[in-house]
Every structure is written in structure tokens, then in C-alpha cells.
Amino acid sequence: MASGADSKGDDLSTAILKQKNRPNRLIVDEAINEDNSVVSLSQPKMDELQLFRGDTVLLKGKKRREAVCIVLSDDTCSDEKIRMNRVVRNNLRVHLGDVISIQPCPDVKYGKRIHVLPIDDTVEGITGNLFEVYLKPYFLEAYRPIRKGDIFLVRGGMRAVEFKVVETDPSPYCIVAPDTVIHCEGEPIKREDEEESLNEVGYDDIGGCRKQLAQIKEMVELPLRHPALFKAIGVKPPRGILLYGPPGTGKTLIARAVANETGAFFFLINGPEIMSKLAGESESNLRKAFEEAEKNAPAIIFIDELDAIAPKREKTHGEVERRIVSQLLTLMDGLKQRAHVIVMAATNRPNSIDPALRRFGRFDREVDIGIPDATGRLEILQIHTKNMKLADDVDLEQVANETHGHVGADLAALCSEAALQAIRKKMDLIDLEDETIDAEVMNSLAVTMDDFRWALSQSNPSALRETVVEVPQVTWEDIGGLEDVKRELQDLVQYPVEHPDKFLKFGMTPSKGVLFYGPPGCGKTLLAKAIANECQANFISIKGPELLTMWFGESEANVREIFDKARQAAPCVLFFDELDSIAKARGGNIGDGGGAADRVINQILTEMDGMSTKKNVFIIGATNRPDIIDPAILRPGRLDQLIYIPLPDEKSRVAILKANLRKSPVAKDVDLEFLAKMTNGFSGADLTEICQRACKLAIRESIESEIRRERERQTNPSAMEVEEDDPVPEIRRDHFEEAMRFARRSVSDNDIRKYEMFAQTLQQSRGFGSFRFPSGNQGGAGPSQGSGGGTGGSVYTEDNDDDLYG
């Protein structure tokens, strides 16, 4: 039942975004008739709207744009569509497939005079009289309706010229009759000024926050457009909206879009600009802004960076800030009832704003504009790429899935980076010195998926800029052996990120974390890196000792910050290396500054529990002293799975050697299996060291032989004409034999016994290996070895002391 209610509530919250179906709402379609003043409808639709052929109609498009046209009937047009050509579409700021409304406009007067100006780049190099060649034939006997602000295109004399209607009398629209005076004197209009008004932001240019847009629309547009609604129901319309969220999510953009779409007077106050050095002037600046807005109501006042002018009063030492906050409070209370002034503010630090501002009646609605999810990111990418030339192989959905934690600004940067990369590929054809670039080159430019791939590798989300989150370049192939551990990790991290639907189906929240423990040099850190790389999650690595600082309370704040960042960039893997340095058992360590270490542990414990389940944040801890870690961290729900990473057995050692030597040329007669057999008890790091040393020896030999050959060439130039082979083409057996002389085991048997004991005690405390349900359902056999049983049974079952590395 609850889910039904939820879905209903969901529908209501975005109800304002739905287009209402009315007979005069029509879908824009491409025109057959190329005339700029004509739109065509189907005959049944014209009858329904009571229009006749040749009537003047008023069309309303996006961003409050209007146009007047003559309507004709067209039998090929379907009932719900309206055909209009590109000029009309541009004047209405609509694209094909958008919805516009149409209404009859019977009282259009004949114009006394109109003033049109050409747009500069379309009249370059044209000689002769513009009026005679273009305007006169265009308007002759046509009785065209025009509206102030329209741009129309006239073809004639081999060229097409665009004109803009600057003024009409009577305003704002009229019909150009034969006796209308047409002025076309004056400077041509610059294209740039036109483009700017074309690039106004509308709701279509905002992706990834549908719900928030709906909230803002009902808070801003309803009171401004239909104040009677609120009067009828007897409540005061809301006064203020506070938009908050991480930087780059589009707070200022939303405010701009609202201003453009509502057509309200928009007054922008940038926080820091109000401040003035003269006493009392900062407040009067604020007062002036509010007075100005009230004069021009309906109006929207937008305060950007609110935290700059309204910080908490008890925290600030400056007298000016306090007075400004008080002034803002009184102004917002004293906005005359229904003065149709709405105050919007944006900040990315909502908690540093004076609490008096956040009560009802001032900023009563706080809209959290968060980091977009995958569908939101797809919307944003589509908006940014709608003017880009994309190759056919570009899969924006995949790009959206791979950009976890990116906000709108990051995605915009990603698109421009990809486009730049596409240009770089053609750089050999482009000459900077040339005046123009070949049209061929221009037309061949297209952004491919590879360009996006490259841009993806370059960009990281802005939420994580200071903790540089690199997805490591380590794959499963770099890790030899440890098959069971890899499986376990995939279950833990990859599945919740890649198949969240399965977890919903079985009603399970994914587990939060794992602890790797085992002797040093067995690849604990490497595993964590590989898992972050495999599932394309963000990866924050935290070195234990770095969290502790000398200042009181700072260490805990560091922990909080790290967890906040991880939540913002979810899915994210938090990797605590050397966990034992910050999570020692509490109470034992006397003498550290006021129990700082204990407080850090407490902070970590609360953060792990309080990690909201919606976010995919995983914690991986690694330690080689599991015995001194606080037991509270090891309980299920925090680090539920304890995975013992043993010394590699023979098979794993072969795999490690192979993984290490993947990129090196090795002689055929080097028997890695024999090498693995001989290195019993060596950890992964020790084996890597052997390989490195063998490589070093080969490199040294190669360099020395080159020097020797160079000397011989100098002493006897004639004899050395013959080009010799490379003296050391690959790593030979003797290099490995030499390297083995220096090889040593870094982990003693004693250490291993300690780990074995720890693993064994864990095993005993959860040893329900023989658990079976009573015989009714023979099928359900219990898990082979307690729920989190480490890496296969082999490690624990062998009792003989000789073979500790099974």
C-alpha cells in the first residue's frame, strides 16, 4: 500500500511540469510553405478553433516569446500539429516537436509606420538599395502581420538578408498595408547582440533536477502569474527560496531560467558587492535593491552567495555583517503582503547562514539541488551536446553511467574537453596563420566516443578536487592468485553498483565494508585498488596517520569531511590503509592528546553506522595487526567481512610471477614454476622484488654492453660496420639466479602463526560448518563455512605445522 501512496505523492510533486491538454496547444512541425508569415493547420483543427483561412493568429512559444502570423489550411498536416518555417520557429524560440499555443488575434490594426534594420553579417558587401531590392517586394500587397522584435529573412538578388523589426506603430504588432511607411535607416544590428538574446536560459536548458524545478515553479510562477489562487485559498504565497547544493549543480542557472521564463523583473544581488566601506551604506544598498524590485513588481530578487552577506551573527566579529543581516531580516518581513516580490538566494554553505533567515516567512523553502543521478546526467549531456556534431558511435548513456559524482558543470567541461580533443585530431590540417579554415575540415569535424573516453580519463568530479580521486590503473590481471578473495570482493562492491535491482528484489541492503588482514606484502592495498578500478567507482585512499592532527577536534572533522566527500561522489570506495593506526582498541592508549585517538574511532564508528543506505559507499580497511583493532569496528554492519589474505601458495606464486613479468621479455628457458616451488613462504612483495632485481640486472648488462660497443667503435671504426644484434634481448636464467641470491623472506613463521591463530579464533566463534535445517527440506544446505568464512577452507583445516602456506 505504501508504495502506491509513494508513487501518487511522486506524481503530485512534479504535477506542475505536466503540459495540460488544451485544443489550442499544438506540436511544431516542419513547414511545406516557405513563407515567413504563414502557419498551416489541418482543416478540422481550424474548425475546432473557429479560425478561417487568412485569419491573423497570435502564437505563444518558449521564454514568453510571441509571434503573429496568417493561418492557412493544409490537408497533409495532422490534427495536433502546426506547420511553421524556421524563421517563425526562431522567433518563438522553439524546436521541432515542442508545444506552442495558438489563439485568434482579430484586433490587429494596419500599421502607420514600422522601423526595420538589417543584421550586419547578412548585408556585408551588398550594394544598392535594401528597400527596393528586398523589403518592397517582400511586403508588396502581402498584408503581412509583424511583431516588434521579430527577425525575418528575405531572399532576393542572389542573397538572403535578415531584418529585425525594431519598432512598430501601433505597438506591439500590426499589419503592413500598402500605405504603411517602412523605415530602414540606421546602423545594421550586430549579430552578437542578437545571439545573446537567443542564448537566454530556459527550463529546457536545465537537466537533472526535475523535482527541484517543479518545486521552484510552484513557489515562483504560481504566485507571480495567478496570485488570485492563493487569495482564494486564504494563505500567503511563499516569500523566499533558498537554493543550496554543492558548487556546479546549477543554482544560479535555475534562477536565471526562472527569470527568463516568467518574464518577471529580475534583480541580481551578488553577495560581496553590497559591502561598502562607509558606515550605513551597505544597508542602504540592500534597501535600494528591494525598493527597486517593489517598483517593478512582479519581480524576483536573486541573492547569489548568500553566506557572504548573512553569516551567523554570533560567529562574525564585524559590526557591518550583523547590521546587514538585521537589515535583510527586516526587509524580508516588511515586503508588503503580496507585493509580488519573491526573494531567491543561492549558497553552497547553508549551515553558515544566520538561522533567523531560515524561518518560515523569510526563506521558507529550502531546495536542495544535489548531485544528479545517471538519468539526470544523461539529460545534462543531451543539453550540452545538442549543438555538437556527434559521430554515430557516441553512446551518451554509457558516458552518463561512467561519470559518477559529476555535477552539471563537470559534464559541461567534459563535453568541451571531448570537442577540443576532436579538434586536436584535425590539428595537422588546420593552419593557425591562415585567415580561414577549409570548409572540408569544418565539415569533417565530429566528436567520437574515443574523444569522450579521453575526456573521461582527464576529468574528475569537482566535489573531489582536493582529495584527488584517481581510479587506479590496476586490474584483476595484475593480481596473481587469490581467486576466492576476488570473488568475495566482486559480490561486495561490484554487484551493488552494477546490479542494484537484484538487491531490491531480494530486499537486502548491500554490506558496508571489508577488512583485509594478513602478513605484509600480500597485496591488500593492491586488491583495494583493483576493485575500485573494476567497478568504475571513485576511490578515496586514506592513510591512517594523516587523519590525526595536533589541533583539538580537527582529527574528527577530517573524518567527517572525508565521509561527506565520499557520499557526494557515490558510488565510492573509501580505503583505509593501516587501519590499526587510527582504530586501536579504545581506552588502552593513555597519553595521547586528550584521547584524540579514541574520539577519531568514535567518529568513524558513527559515520559508518550513519551512512545513509541509499548511497553506495564502501569501506575497505587493510591492516597487518588485526589483533589490536577495536572490536566495535569489526562487528557486522560496519566491517562485516574479515578476509584473511594468506601468503600465496604455489599456484598463486606462479600467477604473481607471471603478472609481474607480463610486460617484460623473458627467455623461454626460465622456468617460473620451478622458481615458484623454491620460493616457499615468500610474500607477493618478495616475489615482485625478485622480478625487479632480475630486470635490473638485465638492464645493467644491456647498458654496459652498449658502452663497451661504443668504445670499440671509437678505437676501431672500420671493423664495426656490421650492425650487431641486441646483446641482451630478454631476461635470462642467470639474471634470475643472481637475483635469487639476494632474495629473502620478509615474513617469519612466527608472524604467520599469529595470523593463523587469529583466523582460527574467528573461525571457531562462527563455526557452524555442519549446520543443517531439520530434514524436511533436504535442498537447503547451509553455507559451507560460516557466513563470512575467509578464503576457502584450506587455510584453516590443515593441522600439520610444516605446511603453513597451504
Swiss-Prot record:
GO terms for cellular component: cytoplasm; cytoplasmic stress granule; cytosol; nucleus; site of double-strand break; VCP-NPL4-UFD1 AAA ATPase complex. It is an enzyme of class 3 (hydrolase). The modification N6-acetyllysine is found at K502, K505, K668, K754. Residues 777-793 have a biased composition (Gly residues). Its cofactor is Mg(2+). Its main location: cytoplasm. InterPro entries: AAA+_ATPase, AAA_ATPase_CDC48, AAA_ATPase_domain, AAA_lid_3, Asp_de-COase-like_dom_sf, ATPase_AAA_core, ATPase_AAA_CS, Cdc48_dom2. ATP 1 binds at P247, G248, T249, G250, K251, T252, L253, N348, H384. The modification N6-succinyllysine is found at K668. Keywords: Acetylation, ATP-binding, Autophagy, Cytoplasm, DNA damage, DNA repair, Endoplasmic reticulum, Hydrolase, Isopeptide bond, Lipid-binding, Methylation, Nucleotide-binding, Nucleus, Phosphoprotein, Transport, Ubl conjugation, Ubl conjugation pathway. The modification N-acetylalanine is found at A2. Its EC number is 3.6.4.6. The modification Phosphoserine is found at S3, S7, S13, S37, S462, S702, S770, S775, S787. The keyword DNA repair applies. The modification Phosphothreonine is found at T436. The modification N6,N6,N6-trimethyllysine is found at K315. It catalyses: ATP + H2O = ADP + phosphate + H(+). SUPFAM superfamilies: ADC-like, Cdc48 domain 2-like, P-loop containing nucleoside triphosphate hydrolases. GO terms for biological process: autophagosome maturation; autophagy; cellular response to arsenite ion; cellular response to heat; DNA damage response; DNA repair; double-strand break repair; endoplasmic reticulum stress-induced pre-emptive quality control. There is a cross-link at K8, K18 (Glycyl lysine isopeptide (Lys-Gly) (interchain with G-Cter in SUMO2)). Belongs to the AAA ATPase family. NCBIfam families: CDC48 (TIGR01243). This is Transitional endoplasmic reticulum ATPase.
